[in-house]
Amino acid sequence: EQKQIVEFTAGNFDLIHPGYVYTFEAAKEHCDKFIVFLHRDPSEHRKSKYKPVIPIHERYRTLMAIRYIDEVYVYQTEEELRALIEFFKPDIRILGEDYIGKSFTGDDLPPKVVYTTRAHGWSTTKMKDMIAMQTIKQNPEIKEAAEFFERKMEMD
């Protein structure tokens, strides 16, 4: 019997946008099983990270509804993520190209790392900025803030 190819990615997946779906679809094309390790709240241990907007159970349900994802497991700490990687022994890890040359949890473990491109143009930050800009534009009393966000988005 041929061994199943298992891929995984990890993150908090707060606001699911088309870029995630493109990434999940591409990942699933190259494996038999695609697993997502879902970070409950990255802000709890790293103050530079934002607290997720969407509750964990809703993020879990959303990810499980995406047909390219076979399994979702929740973790809180980087130690728990490492334990999941060691337990499942995946063949491939999917990481965003922004991690090239950086250290990350489990970078000393066997899974081959495949970096994904952001050529699709989507990011959670961009999505949050777009929502904020639309909200501001609909409230003329804060026009200066809207103009600030527009300039910021043009620079990103």
PLM regions and their residue ranges:
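Nucleotidyltransferase catalytic core that binds NTPs
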Residues: 1-156
